[in-house]
């Protein structure tokens, strides 16, 4: 019997510890192939880049315990797109993206490369999991800085993701959605449990202000200084609140959908624009 093929990717790059821990944890469930960016691409969302400009390349990589690993000179969504178009042979049965250091909750979901990679697979009718983990101190907009990661409980997030992956492989969802998993940075036994959640309106701590500072010796050039806002206390029903309270957050994500809004001013403006020009002949 053919073992399922699990594609593992991330937005932190091929050398990320979280990627390696996750990939090795999934090897009991099927054949694991890593296809990940060759460098840091946090915040890339579902971008694939201007392919005619970047002319991406693919290189063999070595990850201990994994038979097949590829590094792509492009963002994570491009890694997944290449895979689902057959660049690496057999198409994956499941895409697992992570482990991202820093919870991808609230509006961080929109620009998360971790989530964007899984959604790109979903566009090709391949179910996916995006797994992220909160960090000590604070992570801003879904990103954790290196100095915060010394005490990261990678194995906890990998265990949760592996359990979910096993269930999805055994009983695939009727629609190829993406399960966005956010795990507190705690040992499994210290977590409060898990909840189905809605996407919140903000991460635990947001970027609050951006100011331009002149770059010394470079007239007309500026550095951008960012100020962080205060930590928020979001509702428990949201992904943000759930993780902050020590629970695992599970949220199903799907395609971008249209809103049905009543906007007569827009309709009138576009209708006027599209009317035939008046005839100039008598």
Describe these PLM feature segments.
Residues 112-118, 142-168:
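Active-site glycine-rich loop that binds ribose-phosphate moieties when present
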Residues 122-143:
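Glycine-rich phosphate/pyrophosphate-binding loops
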Residues 8-15, 108-109:
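Short, glycine-rich nucleotide/cofactor-binding loops
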Residues 33-35, 70, 96, 127-131, ...:
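Hydrophobic/aromatic beta-strand patches that form the interior of the parallel beta-sheet core
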Residues 2-6, 17-86, 90-91:
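A cross-family phosphate/adenosyl-ligand binding-site feature
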Residues 150-152, 169-282:
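C-terminal accessory domains and tails appended to enzymatic cores
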Residues 103-112:
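Glycine/threonine-rich flexible loop motifs
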Residues 83-89, 116-127:
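Alpha-helix C-terminal capping segments
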């Amino acid at each position: 019997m053919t073992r399922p093929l699990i594609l593992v990717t991330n937005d932190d790059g091929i050398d990320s510890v979280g990627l390696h821990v996750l990939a090795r944890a999934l090897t009991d469930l099927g054949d694991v192939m890593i296809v990940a960016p060759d460098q840091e691409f946090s915040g890339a969302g579902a971008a694939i880049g201007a392919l005619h400009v970047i002319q991406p390349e693919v290189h063999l990589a070595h990850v201990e315990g994994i038979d097949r690993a590829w590094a792509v000179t492009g963002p994570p969504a491009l890694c997944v797109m290449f895979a689902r178009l057959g660049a690496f042979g057999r198409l994956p049965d499941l895409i697992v993206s992570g482990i991202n250091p820093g919870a991808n909750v609230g509006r961080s979901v929109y620009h998360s490369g971790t989530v964007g990679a899984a959604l790109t697979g979903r566009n090709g009718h391949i179910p996916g999991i995006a797994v992220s983990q909160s960090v000590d101190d604070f992570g801003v907009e879904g990103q954790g800085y290196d100095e915060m990661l010394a005490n990261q409980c990678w194995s906890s997030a990998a265990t949760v993701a592996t359990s979910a992956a096993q269930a999805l492989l055994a009983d695939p969802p009727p629609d190829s959605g993406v399960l966005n998993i956010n795990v507190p940075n705690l040992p499994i036994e210290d977590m409060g449990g898990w909840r189905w959640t809605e996407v919140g309106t903000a991460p635990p701590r947001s970027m609050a202000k951006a100011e331009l500072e002149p770059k010394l010796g470079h007239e007309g050039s500026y550095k951008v200084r960012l100020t962080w806002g205060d930590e928020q206390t979001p509702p428990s029903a949201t992904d943000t609140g759930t993780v902050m309270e020590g629970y695992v957050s599970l949220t199903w994500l799907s395609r971008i959908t249209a809103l049905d809004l009543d906007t007569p001013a827009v309709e009138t403006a576009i209708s006027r624009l599209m009317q035939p020009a008046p005839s100039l002949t008598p």
